[in-house]
């Protein structure tokens, strides 16, 4: 039975393509962006999250799993190296302070979930978006899900970082109406410094994708001081100006996700960086407009 590792499903989403959409967030990503606002999506494995502000120190989790401990100050700790993400503690918690990130989902259940919102798609031109993480790391499941959705004439979109083999794109091309393609930085060295990988494969895939004729919306997470410099913006403009099937560029201002990192006992890499201001985001949008590049809000 074909299954996918799904982190979350968001209904009536408005930022993941045209109209109201059902967005499937796939778990697992090849990049480790230092600004990532979904750190729970990075690992392909299920993970246990602890929302410490909800914890009431009832210790029912400890009754079902000895990997939950409390130090002398009463701090709730988890022996994560030994955790198998079985979920027993999640079920035992009376206040939902524990969450399991990632679950195996059958193709049939995923399709049924998407079809439950079909009336909204019909009303406003919405559809389904596969996001992540990186959905094309699970290209077989992604292609199968998109194929079923197209049988119901549902608009489909794939949000990708592009850091996957071209063969993964080929599997979903026939059943994808729109690609949302993330660009982080035009220079490979800077890209590698902040994401863990260079950008050669991403740009190669973007060029190949453009030649297929599929519509592409490029998305740029705007990180102050990293890719907001004049040099970086000029590099972006050069890349975008050469795309024949670019519909628009969307600027995504950096913001913090501290509670998500805390839930996983992770340190937020850019915790000391100020969030992107509205003024900077608008300056960057104006730059692209000045260079005759369509900007989506």
Kindly label every feature range from the protein language model.
Residues 5-7, 73, 159-163:
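Short gly/ser/thr-rich secondary-structure transition/capping motifs
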Residues 34-41, 60-78, 88-104:
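Iron-sulfur cluster-binding cysteine motifs and their immediate structural context
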Residues 17-18, 25, 42-43, 47-52, ...:
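N-terminal-biased segments
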Residues 1-18, 222-297:
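Auxiliary Fe-S-binding modules of radical SAM enzymes
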Residues 7-60, 76-85:
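N-terminal pre-triad scaffold of radical SAM enzymes
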Residues 108-263:
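Conserved AdoMet/S-adenosylmethionine-binding subsite of the radical SAM
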Residues 50-52, 192-198, 265-273:
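Short glycine-enriched, charge-decorated loop/helix-capping segments at active-site entrances
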């Amino acid at each position: 039975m074909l299954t996918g590792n799904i982190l979350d499903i968001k209904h009536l989403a408005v930022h993941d393509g045209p109209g109201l959409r059902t967005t499937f967030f796939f778990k697992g990503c090849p990049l480790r962006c230092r600004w990532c606002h979904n750190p729970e999506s990075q690992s392909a494995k299920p993970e246990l999250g602890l929302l410490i502000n909800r914890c009431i120190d009832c210790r029912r989790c400890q009754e079902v799993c000895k990997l939950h401990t409390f130090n002398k100050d009463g701090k709730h700790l988890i022996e994560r190296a030994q955790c198998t993400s079985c979920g027993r503690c999640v079920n035992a918690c009376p206040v939902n302070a524990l969450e399991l990130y990632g679950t195996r989902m059958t193709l049939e259940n995923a399709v049924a979930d998407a079809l439950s919102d079909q009336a909204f798609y019909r009303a406003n031109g919405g559809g389904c978006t596969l996001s992540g993480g990186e959905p094309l790391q699970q290209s077989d499941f992604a292609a199968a899900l998109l194929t079923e959705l197209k049988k119901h004439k549902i608009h489909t979109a794939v949000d990708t970082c592009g850091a996957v083999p071209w063969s993964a794109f080929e599997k979903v091309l026939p059943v994808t109406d729109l690609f949302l393609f993330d660009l982080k930085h035009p220079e490979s060295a800077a890209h590698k410094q902040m994401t863990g990988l260079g950008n050669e494969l991403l740009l190669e895939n973007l060029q190949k994708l453009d030649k297929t004729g599929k519509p592409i919306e490029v998305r740029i997470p705007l990180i102050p001081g990293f890719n907001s410099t004049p040099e970086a913006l000029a590099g972006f403009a050069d890349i975008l100006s050469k795309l024949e099937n670019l519909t628009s560029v969307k600027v995504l201002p950096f913001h913090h996700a501290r509670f998500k990192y805390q839930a996983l006992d992770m340190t937020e890499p850019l915790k000391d960086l100020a969030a992107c201001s509205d003024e900077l985001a608008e300056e960057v949008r104006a730059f692209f407009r000045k260079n005759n590049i369509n900007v989506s809000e």
